């Protein structure tokens, strides 16, 4: 059955099937704006405006070696072409029509983009590690050294006993004690480790709590920075006569990154590092980054711009002053060594065969030596066999680097060994330093509780990582470690003791307000609290300080100690002297309890009558 519609469609609408189709509606032609010169001026003006806003916000380096520069130029060209579409009255359709328009009306942007693409491709090819493996492996000049003869034993006042996490904890706690600052400011996350007056410290500025607090305090700037002593764990708040106005926490023109970009538009920079000079003036050390292989490969640093954080004054130094500690970042040095370790026998050897291919271990630490800070990291074979074959020490100011052959356990194996000694206390080990103890390569690390506070110290022999010593102070730890080395016939009898000179001692005087005693591992330990103190500040062992049992409340004493005998809670006495005028009474009767199973002897100590 055929169904026919005549005069109306299926929906009931009238139509004439024989009528001719209606012609398409013609598009009304768009008119171009002004003259050709006027259109070019408008297009250029809008492009420059967009470029200025982008440059102010994103701050790309105007440098062919900077990848972001290509994106910036591409944005300018695209902006110009879009403006030209509107100002020229373009009505084309399809990709072909747009392409034809761009070639005719946007000739300059078209050829600029084409040139950029060619330049980027050639630059990437000339930077390709497959073709330039020899150049990549030569980025970091490396000399070999002898551990026993070149690595000197470090005195206690040069060993950093805090890691970054513990320093941050102390910094936050210190700011919380400052009622005039804690409501407006926070501690920044820099915590740069430097050598300051011959001591290892971490320094960090404050930052504004939020945008409102920045608005309220911007005219005065940031009022202070913190110095955390890595040996004594003391935190000092350095208040400035004039606040820091050029930091990473600032906004607009005083923002450090923007300040650098406007002053040095063609420079590429590493992440700025906060340091202070020997006078305590805060600076930002901004290493100048360069690409040395092709256009985009072989990242290296060449000199640095120093920016005064207070005034904003800046100057480029090809050779930075001696007080500067961080020109080459740890990440850069490690990256360059990994290039050396992988490619010194060619690129294809790093994939097939892997003869003598080495890489750095996961993790690194810092060590103060002379006036500089050295990066330490281990070196292992590419197979990852849980053992080190040596380690690197690299000067972060000059990039002078030495490799020391030293086979033994990896840092993480040593950390596991140390944690195993205190597993009942659940302490965590920090990433270790490598020290020379009686010509034995030794891992040194702090043991922290869950609150990130340092409670003990550990030393692990690199060659025989089952030799582990712990102690409440660095001195205790070293003494125990030397005895273990002696028992294992690794050192001679004359190396089993620690040489001490009178200059190694410091002293503190006070009148005894309270004495408590405890028995730890069979030894009588005495804890002293002086007048004016709210907590016990001196700990002494009767085995080392013979006069300790004769002390009484009311005695005025001078306690001698060494830097390495200092913990967060007390100093470890090496000797005590009874000063003139003190009471000379009979020895008190002492009552004590065993604390072999206690983590804190003071909590279990009994007060002496």
Predicted regions and their residues:
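Soluble extracytoplasmic regions of secretory-pathway and membrane proteins
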Residues: 2-609
């Amino acid at each position: 059955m055929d169904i026919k519609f005549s005069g109306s469609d299926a929906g009931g609408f009238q139509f004439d099937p024989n009528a001719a189709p209606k012609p398409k509606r013609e598009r009304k032609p768009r008119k171009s704006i002004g003259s050709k010169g006027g259109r070019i001026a408008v297009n250029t003006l809008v492009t420059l405006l967009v470029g200025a806003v982008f440059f102010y916000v994103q701050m790309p380096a105007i440098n062919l070696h900077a990848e972001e520069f290509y994106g910036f130029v591409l944005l300018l060209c695209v902006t110009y072409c879009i403006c030209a579409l509107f100002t020229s009255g373009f009505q084309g359709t399809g990709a072909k029509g747009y392409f034809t328009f761009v070639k005719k009306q946007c000739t300059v942007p078209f050829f600029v983009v084409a040139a950029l693409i060619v330049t980027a491709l050639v630059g990437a090819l000339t930077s390709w590690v497959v073709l330039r493996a020899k150049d990549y492996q030569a980025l970091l000049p490396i000399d070999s050294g002898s551990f026993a003869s070149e690595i000197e034993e470090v005195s206690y006042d040069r060993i950093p006993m805090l890691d970054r996490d513990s320093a941050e904890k102390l910094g936050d706690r210190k700011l919380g004690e400052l009622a005039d600052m804690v409501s407006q400011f926070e501690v920044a996350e820099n915590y740069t480790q430097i050598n300051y007056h011959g001591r290892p410290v971490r320094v960090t500025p404050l930052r504004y709590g939020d945008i409102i607090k920045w608005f309220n305090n911007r005219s005065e700037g940031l009022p202070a920075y913190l110095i955390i002593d890595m040996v004594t764990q003391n935190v000092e708040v350095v208040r400035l006569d004039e606040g820091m106005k050029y930091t990473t926490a600032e906004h607009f023109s005083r923002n450090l990154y923007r300040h650098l970009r406007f002053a040095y538009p063609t420079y590429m920079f590493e992440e700025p590092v906060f340091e202070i000079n020997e006078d305590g003036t805060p600076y930002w050390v901004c290493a100048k980054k360069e690409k040395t292989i092709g256009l985009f490969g072989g990242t290296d640093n060449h000199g640095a711009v120093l920016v005064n954080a207070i005034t904003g004054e800046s100057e480029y130094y090809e050779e930075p002053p001696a007080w500067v500690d961080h020109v080459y970042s740890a990440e850069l040095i490690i990256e360059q060594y990994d290039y050396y370790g992988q490619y010194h026998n060619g690129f294809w050897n790093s994939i097939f065969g892997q003869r003598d291919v080495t890489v750095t271990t996961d993790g690194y630490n810092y060590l103060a030596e002379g006036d500089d800070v050295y990066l330490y990291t281990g070196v292992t074979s590419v197979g990852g066999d849980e053992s080190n074959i040596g380690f690197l020490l690299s000067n972060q100011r000059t990039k002078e680097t030495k490799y020391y052959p030293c086979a033994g356990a990896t840092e993480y194996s040593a950390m596991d060994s140390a944690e195993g000694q205190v597993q009942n206390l659940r302490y965590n080990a920090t990433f270790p330093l490598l020290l020379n103890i009686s010509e034995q390569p030794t891992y040194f690390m702090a043991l922290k509780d869950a609150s990130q506070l340092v409670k003990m110290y550990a030393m692990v022999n690199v060659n025989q990582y089952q030799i582990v010593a712990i102690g409440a102070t660095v001195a205790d730890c070293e003494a125990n470690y030397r005895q273990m080395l002696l028992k294992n016939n690794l050192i001679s009898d004359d190396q089993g003791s620690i040489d001490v000179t009178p200059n190694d001692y410091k002293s503190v005087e006070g009148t005894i307000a309270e004495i408590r005693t405890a028995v730890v591992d069979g030894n009588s330990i005495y804890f002293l609290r002086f007048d004016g103190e709210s907590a016990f500040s001196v700990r002494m062992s009767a085995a080392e300080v013979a006069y300790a049992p004769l002390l009484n409340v009311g005695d005025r004493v001078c306690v001698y100690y060494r830097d390495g005998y200092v913990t967060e809670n007390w100093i470890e006495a090496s000797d005590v002297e009874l000063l003139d005028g003190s009471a000379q009474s009979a020895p008190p009767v002492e009552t004590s309890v065993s604390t072999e199973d206690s983590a804190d002897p003071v909590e279990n100590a009994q007060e002496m009558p």
